[in-house]
Amino acid sequence: MIIIQEKNIEQIPILEIVQEENKDKMIPTVVCYHGWTGSKENCIHYGAMLAKNGMRAILPDQLYHGERKTSELNGFELWEIIGQNVKEFPTLVGAYQKENLVDNKIGAIGFSMGGMTTYALLKHFPFLYAAVSLMGNADPVEFAKWSLTSTWMEDKPAVELTPELMDKYIPMLQSLSLADTPEKIAGRPVLIWHGVEDKKVPYALNHAFYEKIKDEPYANRVKWIETPDVPHFVTFKAIEASVEFLKQTLVEE
């Protein structure tokens, strides 16, 4: 039987999803990050699939989302949220390590904003064993430049990309950029998926990152999957593929 528990880890609301017979065992653990304006509840079906395949799923509410929502979002909070996810990731993992519920088989998966988070986690945490990024982006600087003339700016005041604005935000964006230091993938298993017709988190930027790294030794376990005619939406086949990928790399290796 699959059990879902509400927990709070140092003021981070989470759902933990695991098979009942595994709840007190040391098993592979995956942190699942929802997308923009989503919540931990949006990932329950995915967490259940992970649990059925021998993993523990941790589903946090990200900053300004779910139980942590304080007001309506305007889009400019994106990188603050991803930066906070990076700060909180070792806290979430550490809580389970203290209880001897996870060893080195630690994974992360994210959708859209969560997929961007997954890339940032690969940059910062060598202990992350395997990762899945679904319709994410590994290059915050290029994404930020693109977003200024994209659908992200609908109903928002125009922003001029001045040198002063660039000086203010570029260091923070670079600190989250796996594209700047792709060698930090370091041979780890990474699955990347994107819908070709995605206009909200552009396919082209993500595919360009993959093309840049695919023949490098450090990326020998990076797998790319794309689905034609799919917009900003994760297909069930992509979810199935990501569950199988994490099962193979975290449970069966």
Predicted regions and their residues:
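N-terminal cap/lid segment of alpha/beta-hydrolase-fold proteins
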Residues: 1-24
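Short beta-strand element of the alpha/beta-hydrolase
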Residues: 25-35
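The serine-hydrolase catalytic nucleophile loop
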Residues: 36-48
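Conserved alpha/beta-hydrolase
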Residues: 47-72
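Alpha/beta-hydrolase active-site loop
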Residues: 77-99
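Primarily recognizes the serine-hydrolase "nucleophile elbow" in alpha/beta-hydrolase
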Residues: 92-149
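The feature captures the conserved acid-bearing segment of alpha/beta-hydrolase catalytic domains
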Residues: 152-202
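C-terminal catalytic histidine-bearing segment of alpha/beta-hydrolase fold enzymes
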Residues: 207-210, 214-253
